[in-house]
């Protein structure tokens, strides 16, 4: 079955079927923008909510801490309405709702971004239902409607979309993305909302019920592909991992080792593959073990710094997933900015789940197979 998945997806690519490629560009992170405006320290001090709150929201109210998006840098273009209005969105496999700012939102965050005007769209229909997503320091309030969303060559009609009427604080003011397009399972979506990719599948708008993500380390060639697997973005073979809970893209990690010694996830643990989270997030005790092993030291805001001169001496961290080893070298799990190096590992106090974000996806081409509820991983080029 797994070989058939690859053959069909690659065949579809070669035949030029409904294959949709969305170039992702690497923009300025929210962290860097806040730092430039002198707001980063205040933001970090005010964040009281753990990463895991993103993974506990159901019904009309969802919870997503802003720290999830602090280092996100990969964004793409979509178009909403008739005639189309352009938006930059974060494609997020860790959530399922789709929302953009609207003209009814007067907060600074909305004023600094593209705002959707439903009055100018002949295809917009007001659903008359509220949407609320909690973001640590406040809530995004909005309304739900239907409209046509265009993603590259796909025209997706009658798509539910959230239109924000209020966005929290000033933090989103400096984000390079306007809105968020969730790509997790429909069980995570707000009430009355259908995820964009589900609507595409239901209307047979994609060649295969899967999508794949390549995140270029330099940000120049990053790509989201809907309906196909593109072998030009990886080397070797794809290895398949069963989804254990059909809410997130969740699977079992066997262990995390350094030099053959288990340092985290002993006996196995659950992990989520999440394009909307930038770092590698895990339980506090596990992350502390890893930070100590790689020589990272905690700063006053709870983040971990690394001496850039030590990168060549630091160990490789290996994730074992479904019997396959996925090594991460120091250059993969650290980031460097203006002479400062930071660990790509982040602790979470309130969850035993791991979150494998962009740090992992940059190293491993990722396939999200809804038809068979599998995740495919291969070494990225």
Curated annotation (Swiss-Prot):
Residues 74-378 form the Peptidase A1 domain. Belongs to the peptidase A1 family. Residues 1-16 form the signal peptide. GO terms for biological process: digestion; proteolysis. Its EC number is 3.4.23.4. CDD domains: pepsin_A. Disulfide bonds join 105-110, 265-269, 308-341. It comes from the Eukaryota. This is Chymosin. Residues 17-58 form a propeptide. Monomer. Keywords: Aspartyl protease, Digestion, Disulfide bond, Hydrolase, Protease, Signal, Zymogen. It catalyses: Broad specificity similar to that of pepsin A. Clots milk by cleavage of a single 104-Ser-Phe-|-Met-Ala-107 bond in kappa-chain of casein. GO terms for molecular function: aspartic-type endopeptidase activity.
